[in-house]
From Swiss-Prot:
SUPFAM superfamilies from the UniProt entry: ARM repeat, Clathrin adaptor appendage domain, Subdomain of clathrin and coatomer appendage domain
Biological classification of the source: Eukaryota, Amoebozoa, Evosea, Eumycetozoa, Dictyostelia
Name assigned to this protein: AP-2 complex subunit alpha-2
Record-level GO cellular component terms: AP-2 adaptor complex; clathrin coat of coated pit; clathrin-coated vesicle; contractile vacuole; plasma membrane
GO biological process: clathrin-dependent endocytosis; hypotonic response; intracellular protein transport; intracellular water homeostasis
The entry's keywords: Cell membrane, Coated pit, Endocytosis, Lipid-binding, Membrane, Protein transport, Repeat, Transport
Protein purpose: Component of the adaptor complexes which link clathrin to receptors in coated vesicles. Clathrin-associated protein complexes are believed to interact with the cytoplasmic tails of membrane proteins, leading to their selection and concentration.
Region named Disordered: 610-745
Biased composition (Polar residues): 624-638, 704-714
Disulfide bridge map: none
Repeat positions for HEAT: 112-149, 188-225, 368-402, 403-440
Main location: membrane
């Protein structure tokens, strides 16, 4: 092929027609005139392309440029693409360049024309022209899809390692591979690439090396395993540049040798442990020492000189912190960082504080090294730049230990009074964590939290004051002190509502410990709390009503005052307050023994290993630099107390009162938590069998929503075996590294099945959770349409790479998931919106397959999404006569199914009604069957396969004494009849 590329520029002759056209559009007096001009020009160009068979390269180039310009103005194009493809075949650079520019603007990765130009890409890559190869590589980066990447990546790899390729082409090859791998994770694997990419590190051109290191850093960040062979050559390059001073003069930037390459080489080493061989470790130590020496000997220069020098220096510091194996270098690092945090330049101080935060988290020795800079860091809290203040706060958090805790917490409390609102929430979280983590006595911890509430109550989350009441409840030696301290704090005229909550709880439980003091007598305690009542919100008022009920049990002399309050709120507008008032009034009036049983002092919580400190998850969201700080140290005080067995069956506040009499009179059930704090251990709840007195659906409503604050799932189905009937199949899990059978005896399978069943009844919660991954969802449904938000949380300490989710539609249900990022960083979360629509009956839930890589092994998880047909049911309310009239019109199989089954737990009709109506969206019809042990229900499915809505009618006859049920379903669709049967048996059995 002959190449006419003497001057790689666009044609010397200007395209006057294009210039005039652009001028006409810019000078158009109105939008209408512009549209007329565009329409006229499009018609002319279309005619030329269609009729003029002898159009030359110049005209084709000019017309394509006009089309591209019109497209950039927002006008749609339905022609001209093939003319741009024709320009790609030209041997003239000016024409080929316009062709690539046009296709880069007009096409995208999913365009149907893309496969047609793959051969053009290939021909230009094989050409002997550097400029043609560069154009093709740029286009592949911009519009190349997965098919293009897989087809051309071997050819690009050959160009990268070929001795005949120019440095310009090699640089673009490395960057093209980087771009393709970012869009299609897993394209570049160590097995087939490491040897060839490492060989390019011998390239003498520093531009090629800089581009290649960008690629290697990206690959190592995804998964460092397999890329270790590059380490010796990277160390050799650093030695060559820093120690041997072997480098091209043109790569010296303001007296610093190739700072960009040095930074990339040092950064690459941070993804790997220290070199195994002693020689490599020794050379690396010499290199880092030389970097420090260069910074010491460097004279003050221009801003560019300082920036380039500091860039290398900070990367070397980060590498030393990562390796953590040379005491001499660590000491030098502490001295350098101490110097950096005192300079005037804000950016350097910021980087110094950030690096010192990482340095402090290494060990006790490194933390001690920087103790002498504590006063300097405290001064940084008063810096005018909020980013400096945030870094200083993080550093103080990392520097804190048992010896300095009280001083640092006192300084932070003082600073809290004047701190910006933007930083107060983070500051409160850190103070609370430090106070709990390093508390030498509990009274000091209580004082700190109360001071936090007084100073910045709006920023104190519920987690913090929940933690206070747990600790006070668990330690008798501070209960009187806490009650006295809270009582004194409540005497202030302006009390924050959070303080009132704490006061209400602690005085309700332990107010009797200070009642002997005339200044804090029972009546005084009641009056102080009630004086705040009208200023509080509904949740706090509900808690105070519980406190008043506790007062009646502790101080009978307050019965009249508290009952007056209960009577006043029997008709309160808020349902929760009204319900509590009514039930507490009856409870305190009818049976003293019952009242004493229900309102007894809450028992101590059982200590159990907790996954986080007071608010560690929230603190992590505030960029707390030491991940270890979010973990709980050993010892009872720093562990999260869990409730005793007596508290493991507590219900949410909205449901406590409705079940009050039944709960207390039932054998084996636990006392209520009148304050509604939900302080129980959900993991222990999961192990408890479902009791008759607690309806299944009420338990399911306790399930937590999936959020960055991770928590244990609550299984409301206990150890039930899965149903293998019909279409209601098990939400099985399969992992390629450790296959798990679908049998119901496996603990993981039981947990997954329980989560799946629960989410079939509620709209949000956790679907799957193990030590690496947590999958949660939130859903909503309306008129045959649904929206699902899937959450993928990385619970591990390493990134999950090649993260890919496959969701396939099923017959009757169309799913449209959005794409997600391919990597989940440690302790981070991805969200994936999914929209779906129901078109006809469907029997099974759709399957979601999750694939990702962990260090050392690939993982595949297959689950069923809790999208069941009942989510699309609509109410069908019928009178007794209408129901039986319609019932009689359907009979016989397959439209009628009858099945007898035995319940695995005591039959509770109210619980069944809630599961059927609130969970499965099936309308329970009242006063249709005179037998109170029978249930009659109906539902409407609007999307029948014949285009007509389908009515379904259900009867459930129960025998509570024998724990037997007979289920009869009649429907206008055999498929729907069988599906409803499986759903009901699964959730009622």
């Amino acid at each position: 092929m002959s190449m006419n590329v003497t001057n790689p520029n666009i044609a010397k002759t200007s395209m006057r027609g294009l210039t005039n056209f652009i001028s006409d559009l810019r000078n158009s007096p109105s939008k209408e005139n512009e549209e007329k001009r565009v329409t006229k020009e499009m018609a002319h160009i279309r005619k030329e392309f269609k009729e003029n068979k002898n159009i030359d390269g110049y005209q084709r180039r000019k017309y394509v440029c006009k089309l591209v310009y019109m497209y950039m103005l927002g006008y749609e194009l339905d022609f001209g693409h093939m003319e741009a493809v024709t320009l790609l075949s030209s041997t003239k650079f000016s024409e080929k360049q316009i062709g690539y520019i046009a296709l880069g603007i007009l096409l995208n990765e999913q365009h149907e024309m893309l496969p047609l130009i793959i051969n053009s890409f290939k021909e230009d890559l094989l050409a002997r022209s550097d400029y043609f190869q560069s154009l093709a590589l740029a286009a592949i980066c911009n519009i190349g899809g997965k098919e293009v990447a897989e087809f051309l990546s071997p050819l690009i790899q050959k160009l990268l390692i070929a001795n005949t390729s120019s440095p310009m082409v090699k640089k673009r090859c490395a960057l093209a591979i980087l771009r393709m791998n970012r869009k299609h994770i897993g394209l570049v694997t160590p097995d087939s690439w490491v040897e060839r990419l490492v060989s390019v590190l011998d390239e003498p051109d520093f531009g090629v090396l800089t581009s290649l290191m960008s690629l290697l850093i990206e690959l190592a960040s995804e998964n460092p395993i397999g890329w270790e062979p590059a380490i010796p050559k990277v160390i050799h390059l650093l030695k060559k540049i820093i120690i041997n001073k072997e480098f091209p003069k043109e790569y010296v930037y303001y007296h610093v040798t190739c700072p960009w390459l040095q930074v990339k080489l040092l950064k690459f080493l941070r993804y790997f442990p220290a070199p195994d061989d002693s020689q490599g470790g020794k050379v690396l130590g010499e290199i880092l020492t030389a970097v420090f020496a260069q910074s010491e000997s460097a004279k003050a220069g221009t801003v560019n000189h300082k920036n380039s020098l500091n860039a290398v220096l900070f990367e070397a510091i980060n590498l030393i912190i990562h390796l953590d194996n040379d005491p001499v270098l660590l000491k030098q690092t502490s001295l350098l960082l101490g110097r950096f945090i005192t300079v005037k330049e804000t950016n350097i101080r910021y980087l110094g504080l950030e690096a010192m935060s990482h340095f402090a988290s290494l060990s006790n020795e490194t933390s001690i090294m920087i103790k002498k800079y504590q006063d300097t860091v405290l001064l940084s809290l008063k810096d005018s730049d909020i980013s400096i203040r945030r870094r200083a706060l993080d550093l103080l958090y990392g520097m804190c230990d048992k010896n300095t805790c009280k001083h640092i917490v006192a300084e932070l409390l003082s600073y809290l009074q004047t701190a910006d609102y933007a930083i107060r929430e983070e500051l409160v979280i850190k103070i609370a964590n430090l106070a709990e983590k390093f508390a030498s006595n509990y009274s000091w911890y209580v004082d700190v939290i109360l001071q936090l509430i007084t100073t910045a109550g709006d920023f104190v989350s519920d987690d913090i004051w929940f933690r206070v009441v747990k600790i006070v409840t668990n330690h008798e030696d501070i209960q009187a002190y806490a009650a006295s301290t809270v009582f004194n704090a409540l005497q202030s005229r302006n009390c924050h509502e959070t303080l009132i909550k704490v006061g209400g709880y602690i005085l309700g439980e332990f107010g009797h410990l200070i009642a002997d003091n005339p200044q804090s007598s029972p009546l005084v305690q009641f009056n102080i709390l009630h004086s705040k009542f009208n200023t509080c919100g509904a949740p706090t008022k509900a808690l105070l009503l519980s406190t008043y009920a506790k007062f009646v049990n502790l101080f009978p002399e307050l019965t009249q005052q508290t009952q007056e309050v209960f009577k006043q709120h029997q008709s309160y507008i808020d349902a929760e307050i009204q319900q509590r008032a009514c039930e507490y009034l009856n409870l305190t009036s009818l049976n003293e023994d019952l009242m004493q049983t229900v309102l007894d002092v809450i028992p101590a919580f059982i200590d159990a290993k907790d996954n986080s400190n007071t608010t560690s998850n929230t603190a992590n969201n505030s960029n707390m630099i030491n991940s270890q700080d979010s973990k709980i140290s050993s010892g009872g005080f720093n562990q999260s107390p869990q409730p005793s067995q007596q508290q493991q069956q507590q219900q949410p506040p909205q449901q406590q009162q409705a079940q009050l009499q039944q709960n207390v009179s039932s054998n084996g059930l636990d006392l209520l938590d009148p304050f509604g704090l939900g302080l129980g251990n959900q993991q222990q709840q999961q192990q408890q069998p479902v009791q008759q007195a607690q309806p299944v659906y009420q338990q399911q409503q306790q399930a937590e929503s999936f959020s960055p604050v991770q928590s244990d799932t609550v299984s409301s189905f206990g150890q039930q075996q899965q149903q293998q009937q019909g279409g209601f199949s098990s939400p099985t899990i399969q992992a390629s590294s450790s296959p798990i059978s679908s049998g119901g005896s496996d603990p993981m399978q039981i947990k997954i099945l329980a989560s799946y069943k629960r989410l079939c009844l509620v709209s949000e919660g956790v679907l799957y959770e193990d030590s690496m991954l947590q999958v949660g969802l939130k859903s909503e449904y309306q008129s045959g349409q649904g929206r699902l938000m899937l959450y993928y949380g990385n619970s591990s300490a390493f990134p999950l790479t090649n993260f890919n989710v496959t969701l396939n539609s099923i017959a009757g249900l169309t799913l449209q998931p959005q794409s997600i990022a391919p990597v989940i960083q440690p302790k981070a979360q991805l969200q994936q919106p999914v929209t779906f629509s129901c078109t006809s009956e469907f029997t099974e839930s759709p399957v979601i397959t999750i694939n990702f890589l962990t260090p050392g092994k690939p993982i595949t998880i297959t689950l069923r999404l809790p999208i069941v047909i009942s989510k699309f049911f609509e109410p069908l309310r019928l009178s007794s006569g209408d129901f039986f009239a319609r019932w009689k019109t359907i009979s016989g199989k397959p439209l009628e199914i009858q099945e007898i089954f035995k319940s695995t737990k005591p039959i509770d009709i109210q619980s069944y009604n809630r599961v059927i109506q609130e969970g499965l969206n099936i309308t329970v019809l009242k006063q249709v069957d005179p037998n109170p042990n029978n249930i009659v229900a109906s539902c409407l499915f609007p999307f029948g396969s014949n285009g007509q809505p389908i009515n379904s009618y259900i009867r459930i006859e129960t025998n509570p004494q024998a724990n037997m049920c007979r289920l009869t379903i009649r429907s206008q669709s055999a498929t729907l009849t069988n599906t409803i049967k499986n759903l009901l048996i699964s959730h009622l059995q």
